[in-house]
Protein backbone atom coordinates (compact mmCIF):
# COMPACT_ATOMS: atom_id res chain seq x y z
CA UNK A 1 0.00 0.00 0.00
CA UNK A 2 1.28 3.46 -0.87
CA UNK A 3 0.83 6.51 1.36
CA UNK A 4 0.35 10.03 0.12
CA UNK A 5 2.65 12.78 1.45
CA UNK A 6 -0.27 14.21 3.46
CA UNK A 7 -0.95 10.82 5.08
CA UNK A 8 2.73 10.46 5.95
CA UNK A 9 2.82 13.95 7.52
CA UNK A 10 -0.36 13.18 9.50
CA UNK A 11 1.14 9.93 10.77
CA UNK A 12 4.32 11.69 11.86
CA UNK A 13 2.34 14.38 13.64
CA UNK A 14 0.29 11.72 15.47
CA UNK A 15 3.42 9.84 16.53
CA UNK A 16 4.97 13.08 17.78
CA UNK A 17 1.84 13.96 19.77
CA UNK A 18 1.78 10.50 21.36
CA UNK A 19 5.47 10.72 22.24
CA UNK A 20 5.09 14.16 23.82
CA UNK A 21 2.00 12.97 25.73
CA UNK A 22 3.88 9.96 27.07
CA UNK A 23 6.78 12.14 28.17
CA UNK A 24 4.44 14.56 29.91
CA UNK A 25 2.63 11.74 31.72
CA UNK A 26 5.89 10.18 32.93
CA UNK A 27 7.23 13.57 33.96
CA UNK A 28 4.14 14.51 35.96
CA UNK A 29 4.85 12.32 39.03
CA UNK A 30 8.48 13.45 39.07
CA UNK A 31 7.42 17.09 38.82
CA UNK A 32 4.92 16.61 41.64
CA UNK A 33 7.60 14.96 43.78
CA UNK A 34 10.02 17.81 43.07
CA UNK A 35 7.34 20.35 44.01
CA UNK A 36 6.61 18.52 47.28
CA UNK A 37 10.30 18.33 48.13
CA UNK A 38 10.72 22.03 47.46
CA UNK A 39 7.70 22.81 49.64
CA UNK A 40 9.07 20.55 52.40
CA UNK A 41 12.45 22.31 52.22
CA UNK A 42 10.71 25.65 52.69
CA UNK A 43 9.11 24.24 55.86
CA UNK A 44 12.54 23.02 56.96
CA UNK A 45 11.61 20.14 59.23
CA UNK A 46 9.10 17.52 60.30
CA UNK A 47 8.28 16.92 63.99
CA UNK A 48 7.85 13.21 64.81
CA UNK A 49 6.34 11.93 68.06
CA UNK A 50 7.15 8.22 68.15
CA UNK A 51 7.22 5.19 70.43
CA UNK A 52 9.73 3.44 68.16
CA UNK A 53 12.95 2.66 70.06
CA UNK A 54 15.27 5.67 70.09
CA UNK A 55 18.15 4.02 68.21
CA UNK A 56 15.83 3.00 65.39
CA UNK A 57 13.85 6.25 65.25
CA UNK A 58 17.09 8.22 65.06
CA UNK A 59 18.37 5.89 62.34
CA UNK A 60 15.20 6.41 60.29
CA UNK A 61 15.52 10.18 60.81
CA UNK A 62 19.11 10.20 59.56
CA UNK A 63 18.22 8.12 56.51
CA UNK A 64 15.45 10.59 55.67
CA UNK A 65 17.73 13.60 56.11
CA UNK A 66 20.29 11.95 53.82
CA UNK A 67 17.65 11.22 51.18
CA UNK A 68 16.13 14.70 51.41
CA UNK A 69 18.79 17.29 52.32
CA UNK A 70 17.31 20.46 53.72
CA UNK A 71 14.51 18.75 55.67
CA UNK A 72 15.34 17.88 59.28
CA UNK A 73 13.52 15.35 61.46
CA UNK A 74 12.87 16.43 65.04
CA UNK A 75 12.46 13.17 66.97
CA UNK A 76 10.52 13.06 70.24
CA UNK A 77 10.63 9.49 71.54
CA UNK A 78 8.70 8.24 74.59
CA UNK A 79 6.06 5.67 75.53
CA UNK A 80 2.76 5.53 73.68
CA UNK A 81 0.60 6.72 76.57
CA UNK A 82 2.95 9.64 77.24
CA UNK A 83 2.78 10.65 73.58
CA UNK A 84 -1.01 10.88 73.62
CA UNK A 85 -0.97 12.70 76.95
CA UNK A 86 1.56 15.24 75.70
CA UNK A 87 -0.29 15.81 72.44
CA UNK A 88 -3.62 16.44 74.18
CA UNK A 89 -2.04 18.73 76.78
CA UNK A 90 -0.35 20.74 74.03
CA UNK A 91 -3.62 21.15 72.15
CA UNK A 92 -5.38 22.33 75.31
CA UNK A 93 -2.70 25.03 75.51
CA UNK A 94 -3.17 25.78 71.78
CA UNK A 95 0.29 24.42 71.00
CA UNK A 96 0.37 22.73 67.59
CA UNK A 97 3.77 21.11 67.43
CA UNK A 98 3.58 17.53 66.12
CA UNK A 99 3.38 16.64 62.42
CA UNK A 100 3.53 12.84 62.47
CA UNK A 101 2.35 10.76 65.43
CA UNK A 102 3.25 7.10 65.91
CA UNK A 103 2.24 5.04 68.96
CA UNK A 104 1.73 1.37 69.74
CA UNK A 105 -1.84 1.80 70.95
CA UNK A 106 -4.27 1.45 68.06
CA UNK A 107 -7.02 2.76 70.32
CA UNK A 108 -5.36 6.19 70.28
CA UNK A 109 -6.19 6.52 66.60
CA UNK A 110 -9.86 5.82 67.20
CA UNK A 111 -9.89 8.74 69.64
CA UNK A 112 -7.80 11.04 67.44
CA UNK A 113 -9.95 10.32 64.40
CA UNK A 114 -13.15 11.00 66.36
CA UNK A 115 -11.72 14.34 67.45
CA UNK A 116 -10.78 15.16 63.83
CA UNK A 117 -7.11 15.47 64.76
CA UNK A 118 -5.81 13.33 61.90
CA UNK A 119 -5.26 14.20 58.25
CA UNK A 120 -6.60 11.80 55.64
CA UNK A 121 -3.50 10.75 53.71
CA UNK A 122 -2.60 7.51 51.96
CA UNK A 123 1.15 6.88 51.70
CA UNK A 124 2.43 5.52 48.40
CA UNK A 125 2.25 1.73 48.19
CA UNK A 126 0.17 0.96 51.29
CA UNK A 127 -2.69 -0.30 49.12
CA UNK A 128 -0.68 -3.56 49.01
CA UNK A 129 -0.46 -3.87 52.82
CA UNK A 130 -2.40 -6.50 54.75
CA UNK A 131 -5.90 -5.42 55.81
CA UNK A 132 -4.99 -5.27 59.50
CA UNK A 133 -2.46 -2.52 58.76
CA UNK A 134 -4.91 -0.12 57.08
CA UNK A 135 -7.58 2.24 58.37
CA UNK A 136 -10.60 1.84 56.12
CA UNK A 137 -11.09 5.62 56.09
CA UNK A 138 -7.48 6.37 55.13
CA UNK A 139 -6.39 8.29 58.24
CA UNK A 140 -3.72 5.97 59.65
CA UNK A 141 -1.66 2.91 58.70
CA UNK A 142 0.32 0.31 60.64
CA UNK A 143 4.00 1.24 60.54
CA UNK A 144 5.12 -1.89 62.35
CA UNK A 145 3.86 -4.82 64.39
CA UNK A 146 5.06 -6.96 67.24
CA UNK A 147 3.77 -9.83 69.33
CA UNK A 148 3.92 -10.12 73.12
CA UNK A 149 5.76 -13.16 74.42
CA UNK A 150 7.29 -14.74 77.51
CA UNK A 151 11.09 -14.73 77.75
CA UNK A 152 13.60 -16.22 80.18
CA UNK A 153 17.30 -16.18 81.04
CA UNK A 154 18.75 -19.50 79.88
CA UNK A 155 21.62 -19.29 82.40
CA UNK A 156 19.18 -19.08 85.29
CA UNK A 157 16.43 -21.39 84.06
CA UNK A 158 16.52 -24.56 81.98
CA UNK A 159 14.29 -25.04 78.96
CA UNK A 160 12.52 -27.86 80.81
CA UNK A 161 11.45 -25.65 83.72
CA UNK A 162 10.71 -22.49 81.70
CA UNK A 163 7.04 -21.39 81.55
CA UNK A 164 5.32 -22.41 78.32
CA UNK A 165 1.86 -20.92 78.78
CA UNK A 166 0.54 -17.61 80.11
CA UNK A 167 -0.85 -19.39 83.18
CA UNK A 168 2.47 -21.10 83.93
CA UNK A 169 3.84 -17.80 85.30
CA UNK A 170 1.12 -17.88 87.98
CA UNK A 171 2.88 -20.80 89.71
CA UNK A 172 4.07 -19.67 93.19
CA UNK A 173 7.58 -20.91 92.36
CA UNK A 174 8.02 -17.75 90.25
CA UNK A 175 7.28 -15.41 93.16
CA UNK A 176 9.86 -12.60 93.11
CA UNK A 177 11.41 -13.85 89.85
CA UNK A 178 9.21 -12.10 87.27
CA UNK A 179 9.18 -8.74 85.47
CA UNK A 180 6.28 -7.00 83.70
CA UNK A 181 5.93 -3.78 81.72
CA UNK A 182 3.12 -1.32 82.50
CA UNK A 183 0.01 -0.48 80.41
CA UNK A 184 -0.01 3.01 81.89
CA UNK A 185 3.15 3.73 79.89
CA UNK A 186 3.18 1.26 77.02
CA UNK A 187 0.60 0.84 74.28
CA UNK A 188 2.05 -2.60 73.51
CA UNK A 189 1.30 -3.70 77.06
CA UNK A 190 -2.18 -2.13 77.10
CA UNK A 191 -3.01 -4.33 74.11
CA UNK A 192 -1.40 -7.32 75.83
CA UNK A 193 -3.47 -6.84 78.98
CA UNK A 194 -6.77 -6.63 77.09
CA UNK A 195 -5.91 -9.70 75.00
CA UNK A 196 -5.24 -11.75 78.16
CA UNK A 197 -8.36 -10.39 79.86
CA UNK A 198 -10.28 -11.83 76.90
CA UNK A 199 -8.40 -15.11 77.30
CA UNK A 200 -8.29 -15.59 81.08
CA UNK A 201 -10.21 -12.70 82.69
CA UNK A 202 -9.02 -10.14 85.25
CA UNK A 203 -8.41 -12.99 87.72
CA UNK A 204 -5.27 -13.78 85.71
CA UNK A 205 -3.72 -10.42 86.63
CA UNK A 206 -4.95 -10.65 90.22
CA UNK A 207 -3.13 -13.98 90.52
CA UNK A 208 -0.04 -12.65 88.70
CA UNK A 209 0.22 -9.80 91.19
CA UNK A 210 0.54 -12.37 93.99
CA UNK A 211 3.90 -13.38 92.50
CA UNK A 212 5.25 -9.84 93.08
CA UNK A 213 6.69 -9.13 89.61
CA UNK A 214 9.06 -6.21 89.15
CA UNK A 215 7.26 -3.32 87.43
CA UNK A 216 8.98 -1.48 84.57
CA UNK A 217 7.61 1.00 82.05
CA UNK A 218 8.17 0.20 78.38
CA UNK A 219 7.62 -3.09 76.56
CA UNK A 220 11.34 -2.80 75.74
CA UNK A 221 12.43 -2.77 79.40
CA UNK A 222 11.82 -6.41 80.45
CA UNK A 223 14.47 -7.56 77.98
CA UNK A 224 17.35 -5.92 79.82
CA UNK A 225 16.10 -7.16 83.19
CA UNK A 226 15.94 -10.75 81.93
CA UNK A 227 19.29 -10.57 80.11
CA UNK A 228 21.03 -9.35 83.28
CA UNK A 229 19.43 -12.09 85.36
CA UNK A 230 17.94 -9.58 87.81
CA UNK A 231 14.58 -11.22 87.18
CA UNK A 232 14.90 -14.38 85.06
CA UNK A 233 11.41 -14.40 83.52
CA UNK A 234 9.51 -11.69 81.61
CA UNK A 235 5.75 -12.23 81.61
CA UNK A 236 5.38 -9.88 78.64
CA UNK A 237 7.32 -7.65 76.27
CA UNK A 238 7.73 -7.12 72.55
CA UNK A 239 9.25 -10.21 70.96
CA UNK A 240 11.63 -8.08 68.90
CA UNK A 241 13.46 -6.78 72.01
CA UNK A 242 14.22 -10.30 73.20
CA UNK A 243 15.19 -11.31 69.67
CA UNK A 244 17.70 -8.46 69.45
CA UNK A 245 19.23 -9.34 72.80
CA UNK A 246 19.58 -12.99 71.84
CA UNK A 247 21.24 -12.08 68.52
CA UNK A 248 23.79 -10.03 70.47
CA UNK A 249 24.77 -13.08 72.50
CA UNK A 250 22.69 -12.55 75.63
CA UNK A 251 21.27 -15.64 77.40
CA UNK A 252 17.69 -14.91 76.39
CA UNK A 253 15.18 -17.42 75.05
CA UNK A 254 11.71 -16.61 73.70
CA UNK A 255 8.52 -18.56 74.38
CA UNK A 256 5.47 -18.19 72.14
CA UNK A 257 2.69 -19.46 74.44
CA UNK A 258 0.51 -22.09 72.85
CA UNK A 259 -2.73 -20.26 73.76
CA UNK A 260 -1.69 -17.51 71.36
CA UNK A 261 0.32 -14.27 71.35
CA UNK A 262 -1.18 -10.75 71.42
CA UNK A 263 -0.60 -8.97 68.11
CA UNK A 264 0.13 -5.25 68.37
CA UNK A 265 -0.08 -3.19 65.17
CA UNK A 266 1.41 0.27 65.74
CA UNK A 267 -0.16 2.98 63.53
CA UNK A 268 1.26 6.21 62.17
CA UNK A 269 -0.65 9.28 61.01
CA UNK A 270 -0.27 12.92 60.04
CA UNK A 271 -2.03 15.37 62.34
CA UNK A 272 -4.77 17.55 60.87
CA UNK A 273 -3.02 20.63 62.28
CA UNK A 274 0.50 19.67 61.13
CA UNK A 275 2.64 22.84 61.06
CA UNK A 276 4.83 21.27 58.35
CA UNK A 277 2.29 19.37 56.20
CA UNK A 278 4.44 18.93 53.09
CA UNK A 279 7.38 17.62 55.08
CA UNK A 280 4.95 15.36 56.95
CA UNK A 281 3.64 13.84 53.71
CA UNK A 282 7.16 13.35 52.37
CA UNK A 283 8.28 11.72 55.61
CA UNK A 284 5.20 9.48 55.75
CA UNK A 285 5.81 8.22 52.21
CA UNK A 286 9.41 7.56 53.23
CA UNK A 287 8.70 5.50 56.37
CA UNK A 288 6.18 3.32 54.52
CA UNK A 289 8.56 2.62 51.62
CA UNK A 290 9.86 -0.92 51.17
CA UNK A 291 13.39 0.22 52.03
CA UNK A 292 12.47 1.66 55.44
CA UNK A 293 10.05 -1.16 56.22
CA UNK A 294 12.98 -3.51 55.59
CA UNK A 295 15.17 -1.41 57.91
CA UNK A 296 12.58 -1.88 60.67
CA UNK A 297 12.61 -5.63 60.10
CA UNK A 298 16.42 -5.81 59.99
CA UNK A 299 17.41 -3.44 62.81
CA UNK A 300 14.48 -3.97 65.18
CA UNK A 301 13.31 -7.45 64.26
CA UNK A 302 9.84 -6.01 63.73
CA UNK A 303 7.03 -7.29 61.56
CA UNK A 304 5.54 -4.97 58.93
CA UNK A 305 2.58 -4.92 56.57
CA UNK A 306 4.73 -4.58 53.45
CA UNK A 307 4.46 -7.72 51.29
CA UNK A 308 8.04 -7.46 49.97
CA UNK A 309 9.85 -7.31 53.32
CA UNK A 310 12.10 -10.30 54.02
CA UNK A 311 12.61 -11.75 57.51
CA UNK A 312 15.47 -13.77 59.02
CA UNK A 313 15.08 -17.53 58.83
CA UNK A 314 15.08 -17.82 62.63
CA UNK A 315 12.04 -15.54 63.00
CA UNK A 316 8.60 -17.19 62.91
CA UNK A 317 6.22 -15.81 60.30
CA UNK A 318 3.10 -14.07 61.58
CA UNK A 319 1.03 -16.55 59.60
CA UNK A 320 2.58 -19.43 61.56
CA UNK A 321 1.61 -18.00 64.96
CA UNK A 322 -1.72 -18.16 66.76
CA UNK A 323 -2.51 -14.47 67.08
CA UNK A 324 -4.68 -12.86 69.76
CA UNK A 325 -6.10 -9.72 68.19
CA UNK A 326 -7.78 -6.81 69.96
CA UNK A 327 -10.35 -4.45 68.45
CA UNK A 328 -8.93 -0.87 68.49
CA UNK A 329 -12.33 0.62 69.38
CA UNK A 330 -12.64 -1.65 72.42
CA UNK A 331 -9.05 -0.85 73.37
CA UNK A 332 -9.87 2.87 73.35
CA UNK A 333 -13.10 2.44 75.32
CA UNK A 334 -11.41 0.29 77.98
CA UNK A 335 -8.09 2.15 78.16
CA UNK A 336 -8.79 3.76 81.53
CA UNK A 337 -10.19 0.51 82.91
CA UNK A 338 -7.02 -1.31 81.87
CA UNK A 339 -4.75 1.18 83.61
CA UNK A 340 -6.94 1.47 86.72
CA UNK A 341 -7.31 -2.28 87.26
CA UNK A 342 -3.60 -2.86 86.68
CA UNK A 343 -2.73 -0.29 89.36
CA UNK A 344 -5.36 -1.83 91.65
CA UNK A 345 -3.68 -5.23 91.42
CA UNK A 346 -0.01 -4.25 91.24
CA UNK A 347 -0.05 -1.13 93.40
CA UNK A 348 1.71 1.21 90.98
Which stretches of residues belong to each language-model region?
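Extracytoplasmic ligand-binding site segments that recognize negatively charged/polar headgroups
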Residues: 49-61, 73-92, 96-230
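A bilobed periplasmic-binding-protein/Venus flytrap-type ligand-binding module shared by bacterial periplasmic
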Residues: 149-156, 194, 264-276, 295-296
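A ligand-binding cleft/hinge motif common to bilobed small-molecule-binding domains
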Residues: 107-111, 232-251, 300-301
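Periplasmic-binding protein-like
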Residues: 131, 146, 174-184, 206-209, 215-216, 287-311, ...
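Bacterial N-terminal signal peptides
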Residues: 13-26
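Short beta-strand->loop
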Residues: 118-125, 138-141, 167, 244-262, ...
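Immediate post-signal peptide segment of exported/extracytoplasmic ligand-binding proteins
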Residues: 31-47, 65-66, 171-176
Amino acid sequence: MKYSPSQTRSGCRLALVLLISALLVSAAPAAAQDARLEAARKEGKVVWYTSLALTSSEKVAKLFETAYPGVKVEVHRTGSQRILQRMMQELQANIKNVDVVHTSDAGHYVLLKEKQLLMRYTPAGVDRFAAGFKDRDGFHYGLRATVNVIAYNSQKITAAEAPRTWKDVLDPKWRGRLVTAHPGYSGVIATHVLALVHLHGWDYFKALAQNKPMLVQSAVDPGGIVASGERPVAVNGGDYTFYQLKKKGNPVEIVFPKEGVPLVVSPSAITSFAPHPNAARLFTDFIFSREIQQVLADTEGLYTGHPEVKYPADRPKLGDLKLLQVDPEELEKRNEEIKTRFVEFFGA
